[in-house]
Swiss-Prot record:
Pathway(s) this gene product operates in, as recorded in its UniProt entry: Mycotoxin biosynthesis
Domain of life: Eukaryota
Positions of transmembrane segments: 4-24
Enzyme Commission number, as recorded: 1.14.19.71
GO BP, sorted A to Z: verruculogen biosynthetic process
Catalytic activity: tryprostatin A + reduced [NADPH--hemoprotein reductase] + O2 = fumitremorgin C + oxidized [NADPH--hemoprotein reductase] + 2 H2O + H(+)
Identification of the protein by name: Fumitremorgin C synthase
Job of this protein: Cytochrome P450 monooxygenase; part of the gene cluster that mediates the biosynthesis of fumitremorgins, indole alkaloids that carry not only intriguing chemical structures, but also interesting biological and pharmacological activities. The biosynthesis of fumitremorgin-type alkaloids begins by condensation of the two amino acids L-tryptophan and L-proline to brevianamide F, catalyzed by the non-ribosomal peptide synthetase ftmA. Brevianamide F is then prenylated by the prenyltransferase ftmPT1/ftmB in the presence of dimethylallyl diphosphate, resulting in the formation of tryprostatin B.
Phylogenetic lineage: Eukaryota, Fungi, Dikarya, Ascomycota, Pezizomycotina
Subcellular location: Membrane
Length: 526
């Protein structure tokens, strides 16, 4: 039977109306069912991918700041099938997010990250019973009354740091060894005594870096467009990126490393975090040779301790920022030298009991962390319930981003925000500090991290003059301040020549190194 040709009207219905529907569906501001509030405003979106193509992989915080100047301090973007709400105002953080902590304390679901860590990394757990349990257990060894007992470990490792820098300028490796050894000592009961011991740490960092790079795809770039399109699961599994295969490989390698460390720590003499955690309610320390339950509990314990490593190592990156700030701002460095010399003198190393008399040194640290943040977009969160803010609807399950960089450079808070001015923190101690996050999702190790930063900074600047090596290219400040992605903003490499400020300082370092206590016996009785 001969088919009749389709009329123009029918063709219109078949072709044009579906396209029109999709355009309206994906570009019009979303409205929650049964409500009359719209999402916060934001840039126009494309079907399917939304604004994912507009978010740069590098320095995205400046693009978000540009948008917030147009759409306001609370705005939204669509990242494929995810709605992200971006806050760029300290007032909103303090008076809205902080007051609704239970709503804003979850994490966005990143399939690759969850798969690669087996859903056991506390930093990505959603708000709920498991996360609350892990937070309580980790807080038991990271509360201030406990972290003061780790100060002898920090004394030993920072003394060795100074001694190493007497004979090498390879400061990034020296910083990593120092901070890693503090963590390994209290967590597993073993020191990283020399640079050769960093090989195992390198493997762990390589795995964590690979996982973070894949997770980054959720927030920006062409890779995000590929992995975040709403496609059937069977098709996703056959995508060329083979994300599940990569995730399985990383998970197996990461688990093997963490479980091996945990097993060794359980039988090692003395006290450590692994042993402490294994005795808490809800956590087992099965050796994995018996039933499946034992394997799961050992693996859970291994990730609970191991997931703290990445957070602890942020201190080594922070110290690099502080050293860079010292190189680029010699007047501030001289003022810190003067303060350290007046309080400490030349006959001993700076110590924790000096902190109250070193306000400029502490202000220098705070200003360096504001001037060049390590997490300019904070740690992404997710809402566990719907909310309303300034007349806008924030849906349950939305990703929440805090533009830390925008807040740190808000002229209404920080006068002349692009200038490096440590004294601002002395004049106004209540300025917002966002390095360690906020609310229930604030970094659990912040007290220990603050101690490590203070002691290492005070000792490094007390002991050494720091300068670029002879013949080195000048530091391009813009390049160092404008680098990074949504999840991290680590500094590019740079060189420094460390020179003892006088023979007296060198003698104190060498004498202190010769009488270091046994740090493992110190940590055995926390």
């Amino acid at each position: 039977m001969e088919r009749l040709p389709l009329s123009p009207a029918v063709l219109f219905l078949i072709i044009v109306l579906p396209i029109l529907y999709l355009w309206i569906r994906y570009t019009a501001p979303a409205r929650p069912h049964g409500k009359h509030l719209s999402l916060p405003p934001g840039p126009p979106r494309l079907p399917k991918i939304g604004n994912l193509h507009q978010v740069p992989r590098q320095i995205p915080w400046k693009k978000y700041k540009e948008w917030s100047d147009t759409y306001g301090p609370i705005m939204s973007v669509q990242l494929a099938d995810t709605i992200a709400v971006v806050f760029s105002s300290w007032d909103l953080i303090k008076n809205h997010i902080e007051r609704r902590n239970t709503i804003y304390s979850s994490r966005p679901s990143v399939p690759f990250f969850l798969h690669a860590t087996g859903g056991l990394n506390a930093s990505i757990l959603p708000y709920g019973p498991e996360w609350k349990l892990q937070r309580a257990i980790r807080s038991s060894v990271l509360k201030p009354s406990m972290t003061v007992k780790y100060r002898d470990v920090q004394h030993v490792e920072t003394t060795q740091l100074l001694h190493e820098l007497l004979s090498t300028n390879d400061f990034p490796v020296c910083l990593r060894r120092c901070i890693a050894s503090v963590f390994l000592t209290v967590a597993y009961g073993e020191r990283c005594v020399d640079h050769a011991g960093l090989e195992a740490i390198d493997r762990l960092e390589e795995l964590n870096r690979a996982i973070a790079l894949h997770a980054e795809a959720l927030f920006s770039g062409a890779a995000g467009i590929l992995t975040q399109l709403v496609l059937p699961k069977a098709l996703v599994d056959r995508l060329p990126v083979r994300w599940k295969k990569d995730a399985d490989m990383l998970h197996n390698r990461l688990t093997a490393d963490l479980v091996a460390r945990t097993r060794a720590a359980l039988v090692r003499p003395g006290w450590n975090w692994v042993k402490e955690f294994s005795m808490k309610d809800g956590i087992g320390s099965g050796d994995g040779d018996g039933e499946q339950g034992s394997k799961v509990e050992l693996k859970r314990l291994a990730y609970m301790v191991g997931s703290l490593y990445e957070a602890s190592m942020a201190a080594s990156q922070a110290l690099r920022v502080i050293i860079l700030a010292g190189l680029l701002h010699p007047d501030a460095t001289r003022r810190m030298h003067d303060e350290l010399d007046a309080v400490v003198g030349t006959g001993r190393l700076p110590d924790f009991h000096d902190a109250a008399q070193l306000p400029y040194t502490q202000a220098f640290i705070k200003e360096a962390m504001r001037w060049r943040s390590l997490t300019p977009m904070g740690s992404p969160r997710a809402t566990s319930d719907e909310d309303e803010c300034r007349g806008y609807h924030i849906p349950c399950g939305a990703t929440v981003l805090v533009n830390v960089w925008a807040i740190n450079h808000d002229e209404a808070i920080f006068l002349d925000p692009f200038a490096f001015q440590p004294e601002r923190w002395i004049e106004n101690p209540d300025l917002p500090q966002l390095m360690y996050g906020m609310g229930q999702r604030a970094c659990p190790g912040r007290h220990m991290g603050q101690d490590s930063l203070f002691l290492a900074t005070a000792r490094l600047f007390w002991a050494f003059d720091m300068a670029l090596p002879d013949g080195a290219d000048p530091i391009d400040q813009e390049r160092f301040l404008d680098s990074g992605t949504t999840l991290a903003a680590f500094l590019p490499d740079f060189e420094v020549r460390f020179t003892p400020r006088s023979e007296k300082y060198q003698e104190v370092i060498e004498n202190s190194m010769a009488v270091l206590p046994d740090v493992l016996s110190i940590s055995a009785t926390p």
